[in-house]
Amino acid sequence: MKMKVLEVVGLAISIWLMLTPPASSNIVFDVENATPETYSNFLTSLREAVKDKKLTCHGMIMATTLTEQPKYVLVDLKFGSGTFTLAIRRGNLYLEGYSDIYNGKCRYRIFKDSESDAQETVCPGDKSKPGTQNNIPYEKSYKGMESKGGARTKLGLGKITLKSRMGKIYGKDATDQKQYQKNEAEFLLIAVQMVTEASRFKYIENKVKAKFDDANGYQPDPKAISLEKNWDSVSKVIAKVGTSGDSTVTLPGDLKDENNKPWTTATMNDLKNDIMALLTHVTCKVKSSMFPEIMSYYYRTSISNLGEFE
């Protein structure tokens, strides 16, 4: 009897996994016609797509768990008649791969350490063995990307710089590996910071917006770089604060300010309003949840639907 129950449960889980789409609906960012305002709206939509629907910490939203389905959110970066589709893990905001159109067909590009399902996530139904046109020859870390694209501190973040790098690789032959890999790595370094890092950090979002239309964009300063390295640790420090309201928080030891000086403390209000936009998934010492927001939503929905049965 016990075995039959386990078999039924296993079958139910298998059916659920088959019915659950691997990725949520695409979020579109029109780079060609972007403004600082549409960029900010895009980041808000991305945060909504990856956040835990029930939990917050000190009023801040957090990413969902790594086991929550769907696994990915797809982001379409549009420019002219072309579109790059990025596959981003909802649980940690890692970029696992992307696709463009090459020779009239969807072409996937995946890192050496990409998730095994990234290929079919960006190019549904493509089970082909990865070749020169598909393999990104390094891991998805900054170290990997910088090995081909150079230091990210020298690459500006903004509309013009992003569009420029998109145009250099979209639909281009990847067999000219030296030049293609340099252009691709620069695109990835810019896209990752403008999409995933800016989703995590209001500080980076606001810096990019301030230089959004500048030819050279915003060159990441030491504060931004140190935040990029410490998303987990800053989130955990916030989670350990046991009192609600404003307070002074001791920050992780290797954070830097804009002038590359040690940045040791911040107020909770500063972290909430100016630095963080999305925490990693944490266990918060102060109990909080999305319950009031959820109940408010259902109340408004039920009230608005009362007239439908008249």
From Swiss-Prot:
Enzyme class: hydrolase
Function: Possesses antiviral potency. Inhibits viral infection of plants (tobacco mosaic virus). Inhibits protein synthesis in both prokaryotes and eukaryotes.
Organism field: Phytolacca americana
GO molecular function, one term: toxin activity
UniProt-listed GO biological process terms: defense response to virus; negative regulation of translation
Protein's name according to its UniProt entry: Antiviral protein II/III
Miscellaneous comment in the UniProt entry for this protein: 2 forms exist, PAP-II and PAP-III, that differ in their seasonal expression and chromatographic profiles. Both depurinate genomic RNA of immunodeficiency virus type-I (HIV-I) and bacteriophage (MS 2) RNA. PAP-II and PAP-III inhibit the replication of HIV-1 in human peripheral blood mononuclear cells with IC(50) values of 26 nM and 17 nM, respectively.
Lineage start: Eukaryota, Viridiplantae, Streptophyta, Embryophyta, Tracheophyta
Reactions this protein catalyses: Endohydrolysis of the N-glycosidic bond at one specific adenosine on the 28S rRNA
Family in the record: Belongs to the ribosome-inactivating protein family. Type 1 RIP subfamily.
UniProt keyword list: Antiviral defense, Disulfide bond, Hydrolase, Plant defense, Protein synthesis inhibitor, Signal, Toxin
Disulfide bonds: C57-C284, C106-C123
Entry EC number(s): 3.2.2.22
Alphabetical list of Pfam families matching this protein: RIP (PF00161)
